[in-house]
Amino acid sequence: MINIDGSYGEGGGQVLRTSLSLAAITGEPIRIAGIRAGRRKPGLAAQHLTAVRAAARICHGELQGDALGSTMLEFIPGGGVKAGNYIFDVSEVQQGGSAGAITLVLQTILLPLALADGDSHITLRGGTHVIFSPTVTYIERVYLPMLCRMGIKAQVKLGAWGWYPRGGGEVNLQVKGGCQLCGLNLLERGELKRVQGLAVATELPAHIPQRMANRAENLLRTAGLRVSMQALREKGVAPGAGIFLTAEYCNSLTGFGGFGRLRLSSEKVAEIACGQLLQFHETGAPVDEHLADQLLLPAVLASESSQYKVAEVSTHLTTNAAVIEKFGLGKITVNQAERVVAIASSKV
């Protein structure tokens, strides 16, 4: 059994999700102690518990410690990941519903299902656009297209918007099984081709997304970027608003966003998202700090070595690298000075 210290590094949920994914893929049983010890409320929250049970379900695994607030977990996979049709609902584990990010559940089970024999269809319910988590828009426009370059074939479709704190969103995920993963060489991003933006509001006046879109377009055009904005007013179970920007370079993709909240103007929400994008643009790097740690797992499972340059070497990145190496699947080297990540898969 592989013992994992959940308090290592940034002490967040990434340690748990990566461990669950690799345990399901390799069949290695794991014990995690100190789950999310670095967070204000340690232990398993609704989205983490849903991810735990989802990982166990797709491989008929056994669990101990799978409860809200638990800081200790044992997971014994049960004989290979099984492709199929699955439904995972974050609100089921927390009475009254939850906006727990379903994208974190998605990222936990995606690679195991992509490597399984047969195709899978997964319905996920909960929060689709939640602060401090990848949004479904980011998954659709950045994460999955980048993973497609590495051989992973998956599509996501947003069925209903789900914001914090209500949730109530739904996503349908299609995963092609039997994928053969290849490496990624991404040291240069090339020229910026375009920025695409989506400003959206549910159960709120139409002027809110339009103001976000107008402000973002003005800021990005002033900065000399080619931009195309779309403003949408959608139906939802609760009010919510946000703006989501995707920058397409010749060799890479990146995405940033901002969320509306009380006493924060639509224009300010747009300024926050644009500020993040412009700051990244100035780094010259092809990979943003969030995608940097998300690419590690497919890279270490690939049949070729990978290397890519990142905008920032975050604690999230180095923590995830340390967890992956616990499974003996390869060697990850992070050059802090050059901001280059090199992954030598054991399959090479």
UniProtKB/Swiss-Prot annotation:
One GO BP annotation of this record: RNA processing
Binding residues annotated for ATP, in chain numbering: Q107, H290, L291, A292, D293, Q294
Highest taxon of the lineage: Bacteria
Keyword ATP-binding among record annotations: yes
Catalytic residues in the record: H316
Reaction(s) this enzyme catalyzes, per UniProt: a 3'-end 3'-phospho-ribonucleotide-RNA + ATP = a 3'-end 2',3'-cyclophospho-ribonucleotide-RNA + AMP + diphosphate
CDD domains on file: RNA_Cyclase_Class_II
EC number assigned by the record: 6.5.1.4
Entry GO terms, CC: cytoplasm
Keywords: ATP-binding, Cytoplasm, Ligase, Nucleotide-binding
Primary enzyme class: ligase
Alphabetized Pfam families for the sequence: RTC, RTC_insert
Entry similarity comment: Belongs to the RNA 3'-terminal cyclase family. Type 1 subfamily.
Protein's name according to its UniProt entry: RNA 3'-terminal phosphate cyclase
Organism listed in the record: Nostoc sp. (strain PCC 7120 / SAG 25.82 / UTEX 2576)
Gene responsible for this protein: rtcA
